[in-house]
């Protein structure tokens, strides 16, 4: 029978360095006998303090004095000398602080889950009521988002290597032993699983374990794995009514300073799937919004409902309804225009602003914006989008074709006739009826976009393009203003529409602008180069938001 369940230990597998390794190092540093600390922690004393701890019969704070006393008695019995300031609590605090998530192993678990495996964490863990309990809480919070089940010994009253916990795992996952692969860093924990018929992998080092896991599951893990994305079913969804009959849908994760992620055309909150967990883990409250007209947000048909002035006002209302005085606004594509305007017209509500691909382009009050669009060949598709109903019919006819044609890397974006749409009578003219899915998306992800656009249609999203004159007149009111809030511009080398050179004069209007640049990247920056995007954003956010300079910028 084929494997369909993957069970992972926490310490030493999903979290490194292992506590056992730290205890071993401490034994050596204090010149203690081998296994003096490790033996106690590994429950070599049945019904002793550690077994009670792992079964949830006592808490960490109850366990510490018992272990301190046990260690002092053991030291006298074996003639070992403990330092006066010896503290099990301090040793464990240092061990917990040193641990971090083993990203390659987490990526492997995510890849298996994406392939259809049920994934589970099976760990001997404790009820942590210490003053450092937030360390364990943060790790478990992040990991639990990526697994179907979390089985902790302290919650179920059973520990590895007792056989009953493995039976509990099988019952919980509704699996047979020969359908399960189990990974642990202790052979003693694997033996009962192997005796029951599970496939077992002893994790001595991550690389070897992953090679073995690839072999037994028939799954090839990427050499340069992507950040772990969130899925629609694993995030919290919310709604804010910004005016009668109009609501905005958003996805939320994390705590800390608020970040509003704003997507472009034709996208969804889901386009930020690789950024949401990473930014939340970095210490931020992330709100990824379905922009007006998209997905589960309202999509009124009137063109004027999508005027930039109104869209910005509704973003302010969005913040008000959630009780958020200020937020970091990060936008891509059309939402890049929105976030720059938020910084110009509502700077008091903008803690910082960043745009992917879309530069700040102040209007020329002497030249009609439609003339500008007509003068730039690659903007021809925007002229095609102007007539209500025309582009809607083309894009809604076969949405699988639409999204597979749009979401492609810079190397094969030629499927779209962006510079000849009016001449050819469409933006999809000449594209295959059933294009192959690009390497930056999957069939399942394309299906989610289709599902979302079946709710909203393309009328609302296309209406963002149909307020050009109205937006121009409004934006002229900001002529002469400068953006003084912390700001970041991220350019993508191979974006054929929003080219990096279009941003070259931005420092004239944003004197303290920071920059990031991503090579070999096209228009769909967040999903084409998610690791690079995350690195740039988090570095900037930590500098500007979490550790800001005290120097005034005025």
UniProtKB/Swiss-Prot annotation:
E.C. number: 3.3.2.10, 3.1.3.76
Any Pfam family the entry gives: Hydrolase
Catalysed conversion reaction: an epoxide + H2O = an ethanediol; (9S,10S)-10-hydroxy-9-(phosphooxy)octadecanoate + H2O = (9S,10S)-9,10-dihydroxyoctadecanoate + phosphate; 8-hydroxy-(11S,12S)-epoxy-(5Z,9E,14Z)-eicosatrienoate + H2O = (8,11R,12S)-trihydroxy-(5Z,9E,14Z)-eicosatrienoate; 10-hydroxy-(11S,12S)-epoxy- (5Z,8Z,14Z)-eicosatrienoate + H2O = (10,11S,12R)-trihydroxy-(5Z,8Z,14Z)-eicosatrienoate
Cofactor(s) required for function per UniProt: Mg(2+)
Chain intervals for the UniProt region annotation (Phosphatase): 1-224
Chain sites annotated for binding Mg(2+): 9, 11, 185
N6-acetyllysine, modified sites: 176, 191, 215
Modification N6-succinyllysine, positions: 55, 176, 420, 454, 504, 553
Residues given in the record as phosphate binding sites: 123-124
Domain AB hydrolase-1: 257-530
Post-translational modification: The covalent modification of cysteine by 15-deoxy-Delta12,14-prostaglandin-J2 is autocatalytic and reversible. It may occur as an alternative to other cysteine modifications, such as S-nitrosylation and S-palmitoylation.
Residue numbers of Phosphoserine PTMs: 368
Region (Epoxide hydrolase): 233-554
Result of changing residue 542 to T: Reduces epoxide hydrolase activity by 80%
Similarity comment text for this entry: Belongs to the AB hydrolase superfamily. Epoxide hydrolase family.
Record's subunit section: Homodimer.
Protein name, UniProt field: Bifunctional epoxide hydrolase 2
């Amino acid at each position: 029978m084929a494997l369909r369940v993957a069970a992972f230990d926490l310490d030493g597998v999903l979290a490194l360095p292992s506590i056992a390794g730290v205890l071993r190092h401490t034994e050596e540093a204090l010149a203690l006998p081998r296994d003096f600390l490790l033996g106690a922690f590994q429950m070599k004393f049945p019904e002793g303090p550690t077994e009670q701890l792992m079964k949830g019969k006592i808490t960490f704070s109850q366990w510490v004095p018992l272990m301190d006393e046990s260690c002092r008695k053991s030291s006298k019995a074996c003639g070992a000398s403990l330092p006066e300031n010896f503290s099990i609590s301090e040793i464990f605090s240092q061990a917990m602080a040193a641990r971090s998530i083993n990203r390659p192993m987490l990526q492997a678990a995510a890849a298996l889950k994406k392939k259809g495996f049920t994934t589970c964490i099976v760990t001997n863990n404790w009820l942590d009521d210490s003053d450092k309990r937030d360390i364990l809480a943060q790790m478990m919070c992040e990991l639990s988002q990526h697994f179907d089940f979390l089985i902790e010994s302290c919650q179920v009253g059973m520990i590895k290597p007792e056989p009953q916990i493995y039976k509990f795992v099988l019952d919980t996952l509704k699996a047979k032993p020969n359908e399960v692969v189990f990974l642990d860093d202790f052979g003693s924990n694997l033996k009962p699983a192997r005796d029951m018929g599970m496939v077992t992998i002893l994790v001595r080092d991550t690389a070897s374990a992953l090679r073995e896991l690839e072999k037994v599951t028939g799954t090839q893990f990427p050499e340069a794995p992507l950040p772990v994305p969130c899925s629609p079913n694993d995030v919290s969804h919310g709604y804010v009514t910004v005016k009668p009959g109009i609501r905005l849908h958003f996805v939320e994760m994390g705590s800390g300073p608020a970040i509003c992620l704003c997507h472009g055309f034709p996208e969804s909150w889901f386009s930020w799937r690789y950024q949401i967990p990473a930014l939340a883990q970095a210490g931020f409250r992330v709100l990824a919004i379905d922009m007006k007209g998209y997905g589960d947000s309202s999509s009124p048909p009137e063109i004027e409902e999508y005027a930039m002035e109104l869209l910005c006002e509704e973003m302010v209302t969005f913040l008000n309804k959630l009780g958020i005085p200020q937020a970091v606004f990060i936008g891509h594509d059309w939402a890049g225009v929105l976030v720059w305007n938020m910084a110009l017209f509502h700077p008091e509500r903008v803690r910082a602003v960043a745009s992917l691909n879309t530069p700040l382009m102040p209007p020329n009050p002497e030249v009609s914006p439609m003339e500008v669009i007509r003068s730039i060949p690659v903007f021809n598709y925007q002229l095609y989008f102007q007539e209500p109903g025309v582009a809607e019919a083309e894009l809604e006819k076969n949405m699988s074709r639409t999204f597979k044609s749009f979401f492609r890397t810079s190397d094969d974006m030629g499927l779209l006739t962006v510079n000849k749409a009016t001449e050819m009578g469409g933006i999809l003219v000449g594209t295959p009826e059933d294009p192959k899915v690009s390497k930056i998306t999957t069939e399942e992800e394309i299906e989610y976009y289709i599902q979302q656009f079946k709710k909203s249609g393309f009328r609302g999203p296309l209406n963002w393009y149909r307020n050009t004159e109205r937006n121009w007149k409004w934006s002229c009111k900001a002529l002469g203003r400068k953006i003084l809030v912390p700001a970041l511009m991220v350019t993508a080398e191979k974006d054929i529409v929003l080219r990096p050179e279009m941003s070259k004069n931005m420092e004239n209007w944003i004197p303290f602008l920071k920059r990031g640049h991503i090579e070999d990247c096209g228009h769909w920056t967040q999903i084409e180069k998610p690791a690079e995007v995350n690195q740039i954003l988090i570095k900037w956010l930590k500098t500007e938001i979490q550790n800001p300079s005290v120097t005034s910028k005025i």
